[in-house]
């Protein structure tokens, strides 16, 4: 798989660039595993380099803890909420590999509802983990009913996820039992990642961009950079996020031309930039461009520096947040209001831009922004509801 550049529109600010497009593997794979029509049960298994996994039937996770392999803790995580200690291997696991394609019209089912009855901590397995790999393509398949985050590239480079489906039940569905933290795609300490033309319906963030947690993440020091998330259709879920685990740093991320559809009830924020007290790291050069969210039940746009945490931070443990752009950003029905920008007093946000940002609410058309705190600089052009710039003191 190689990368080819392209000429984007003018960048949203001087230091921003769009990632290049990855192309299919240029080296012919030497192995192919075909899953024909029918149902096939398995515990977690590995894919090695130069392999195609072609799925026509359905791969099911076996419902047995005894037969499921465990793998070591992740070196960039050490907090209680971020998978400490041994964890269960992903159903489909690629590790230390290159030139892998997963394709086909079939289904990979993680039996998430069963797993959630056995354990509620974050040792539950992903459906697919791309771990320290290069040149990986996932296309066509449906990943369904994950026990935890559905698809996770971590410590990887040159990953292309396109034209596939993720169907993970959110906790209110009831059939099957919803699974908390059933994110769609989590890009973690990885570079050169393209996520495009997918349908994602899940029980947490549709797509989020991460880079390790707390002291372990800062010490591991592997940023996520050069990520594009574009032309996706989003069903139920919690929107397009950066964070909250960004201790290794996140930069150069574009979310563009994505649509949260109106035919399902959506919950959570549309765009959510979130950090935790004492995690540190940085979030730089993030752009939300030409996105439409047809219904969100909380904030349409939310920068939140105290996500699930409280207290004070230091210069090292306050996350740096700068150069965040929301342009041509529309929320047709933000039922709980347009949102807020709440930054650290100890380390204010720098260069926040909102341009052609419009939100409305069917439940309270007069409701304004929730607040704006500690924004050192920014630009606000054609924003409704009005009043955000004044709240920010700019």
What do the PLM-derived regions correspond to, one by one?
Residues 1-394:
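Extracellular/periplasmic carbohydrate-active domains that bind, remodel
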């Amino acid at each position: 798989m190689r990368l080819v550049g392209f000429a984007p529109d003018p960048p949203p600010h001087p230091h921003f660039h769009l990632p290049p497009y990855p192309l299919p593997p240029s080296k012919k794979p030497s192995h192919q595993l075909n899953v024909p029509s029918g149902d096939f049960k398995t515990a977690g298994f590995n894919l090695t380099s130069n392999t195609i996994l072609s799925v026509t039937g359905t791969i099911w996770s076996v419902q047995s803890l005894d037969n499921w392999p465990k793998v070591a803790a992740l070196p960039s995580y050490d907090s209680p909420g971020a998978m400490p200690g041994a964890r269960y291997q992903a159903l489909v696991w690629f590790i230390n590999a290159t030139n892998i394609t997963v394709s086909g019209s079939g289904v990979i089912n993680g039996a998430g509802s069963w797993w959630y009855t056995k354990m509620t901590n974050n040792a539950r397995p992903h459906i697919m983990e791309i771990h320290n790999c290069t040149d990986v393509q996932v296309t066509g398949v449906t990943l369904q009913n994950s026990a935890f985050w559905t698809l996770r590239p971590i410590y990887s480079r040159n990953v292309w996820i396109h034209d596939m489906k993720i169907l993970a039940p959110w906790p209110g569905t009831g059939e099957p039992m919803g699974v908390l933290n059933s994110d769609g795609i989590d890009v973690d300490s990885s570079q050169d990642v393209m996520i495009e033309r997918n349908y994602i319906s899940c029980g947490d963030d549709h797509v989020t961009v991460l880079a390790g947690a707390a002291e372990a993440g800062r010490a591991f020091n592997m940023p996520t950079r050069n990520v594009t998330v574009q032309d996706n259709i989003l069903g139920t879920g919690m929107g397009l996020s950066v964070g909250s685990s960004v201790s290794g740093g996140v930069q150069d991320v574009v979310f563009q031309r994505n649509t949260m559809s109106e035919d399902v009830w959506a919950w959570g924020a549309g765009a959510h930039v979130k950090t935790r007290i004492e995690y540190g790291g940085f979030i730089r050069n993030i752009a939300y461009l030409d996105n439409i969210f047809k219904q969100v039940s909380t904030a349409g746009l939310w920068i939140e520096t105290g996500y699930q945490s409280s207290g004070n931070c230091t210069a090292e443990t306050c996350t740096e947040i700068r150069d965040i752009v929301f342009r041509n950003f529309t929320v047709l029905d933000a039922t709980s209001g347009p949102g807020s920008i709440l930054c650290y007093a100890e380390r204010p946000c720098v260069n926040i831009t909102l341009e052609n940002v419009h939100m409305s609410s069917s439940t309270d058309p007069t409701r304004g922004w929730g607040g704006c705190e500690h924004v050192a600089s920014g630009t606000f052009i054609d924003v409704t509801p009005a009043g955000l710039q004044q709240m920010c003191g700019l």
